[in-house]
Amino acid sequence: MVRKLISEFVGTMLLVLFGCGTAVAVNTYVFSIYNISLPFTMLIIALAFGLVLTAIASVIGNVSGAHVNPAVSIAMAIDKRMSIIECVEYVIVQILGGIVGAEILGIIFGGYTSLGANGYGALSALGETTTLATAIIVEVLLTFTFVLVVLVVSAKQDKGTNGIVIGLTLALVHMFGIPFTGTSVNPARSIGPAIFTRGDALSQLWVFIVAPIVGAILAALFYKFVIKERETTKFEFKITNRKLKTSDKVITAVPAVKEAAEVKPAKKVVKKAPAKKEVVKKETTKKAPAKKVVAKTKTTKKDK
């Protein structure tokens, strides 16, 4: 468990360091100095978050699952892929990792005025047109989408492309959400920068904690009751300790084969050979004495 917690701490720290660091670098230097358009800066920031998550998943995916996001860990706990205690431990180290990552950014850029903190209204790229309601709706929907993809992809047996799919999904939601809120979908990514930036970023932080959690819960429930393939209650059996993922025709055929296989041993239990031996013994014991008695009676009559 210690290895998992350390992996989550380091992974979240790197996510904030490279993701938010790219946002700060682009907005502070590239966008202002070279007058690059907003869509291009959005693309750079989105790809930065997606690529760093892909790299993190490739490195620590086999160790901790590479959640690096409290919303993902909460969804995993709801789906019973981890215990509540494990989920709490994951969330704590993820938040700490995000704080350390933001602290490193402040040291690198020589200040804490801009660390890629999330926000709406005056803090967003669209300005005052982004209201509180808009920010909540955007964050809930984006987190729902991202966490749902994580749940579906991580449940598959072939995990070779998981990191790429999840990373591209994170880049996609960033492309959509950056103008509205800067895109959080991850409370640990928002907490660290907001703590050091303070001001409106800190006062608006609750939105980027509550909305992603709500989106994660909705995604977990949708996955559980709509997408997830469950074992049928009619036929309770296991095939190589895996859940059935076949069509209804195969499911009905498999029990029939198993029932036939179970009937054959029942027929073999009836032993016919011992029964024949018992009959032979009874016949020999009855006939032998009868012959001897007849022979004796005949000899006695002749003597007389």
Protein language model annotation of sequence segments:
Residues 1-287, 291-304:
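Membrane-interface helix-loop junctions and terminal tails of multi-pass membrane proteins
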